[in-house]
Structure formats: structure tokens, C-alpha cells
Amino acid sequence: MSMLDFDEVVEHYQRALEEFVKGNPEPNKRLFSHQEDVTLANPLGPAVRGWEQVAATMERAASNYRDGEATGFESVAKYVTAELAYIVEVERYKGRVGGSAEIVAIALRVTSIFRPEDGVWKIVHRHADPIASSRPAESVVQGT
């Protein structure tokens, strides 16, 4: 699997993510591994493992977005080998979130890990959180 192949997969992934913020998880789901070791950690809930849980989590998460569009993908890092690849990006969108009628800006810090399955790069892990800028150390403290 070449770097060129991987770059094409990343482009497909970014287009699928734009569909996701329109409320459609299906293109994104097709890019994920359907194996039991696939994991997803999104900002709307705890991390999940296994295809069935990942698919259900994606469907729930996508249902929170409407009328979205991608406004940019800022590459932080990329690494590709024959057996594993990852990207770290800041994903930027605008759209309606939850029940709000207002279009808002969305920024996510994301790490995605890929591996080849049957000659095709598949996502085996995605971690996304809304931390796209510096925060004070106390921001990690949770109330008791």
C-alpha cells in the first residue's frame, strides 16, 4: 500500500466526515474496520470497542448534526508504513448541533489510525475531542 493510496483514503475520509456533520454516518461507517478490535472515542460519550458498538455510536453521534459542512482539515502529523498509518488533524466544520437552529463553528482535535484489510486501508481507531486550543491545567479537573 503506497503513500498515494493512503492520501486518497484520507481524502475519502474527509468527504465522509462532511457527510457526517450533515447527519449521515453511512460513508464514514464504510471506511471503518468491522473487526472486534476497532475503537472509537468521540466527544459525546465514552470510548467504545467492537464494530457493533462503534457503528451504533456513530449513528447516535451523527444524529446530533445537521446542515454541516467542512471548513478545513489542518494536518498536524501523518505517518505511513506498509502495516499501519495515522493522521493527527484539527477538523473544522460549521453546522447545526443538537436541537439548535443556529449554525455554529466546530473544531475537533482528532487522531485516526488505519491498517490495511484485504488490500484496503481501514480506520481501526478514531479519537476526537474539542480541544483545539490551549487550556489551563485546571481544565482537566472534574467536579466531584
Where in this protein do the model-derived segments appear?
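A beta-strand edge to alpha-helix "cap/lid" segment located at domain peripheries
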Residues: M1-P27, D37-T144
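Conserved catalytic core of Hanks-type protein kinase domains
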Residues: L31-H34
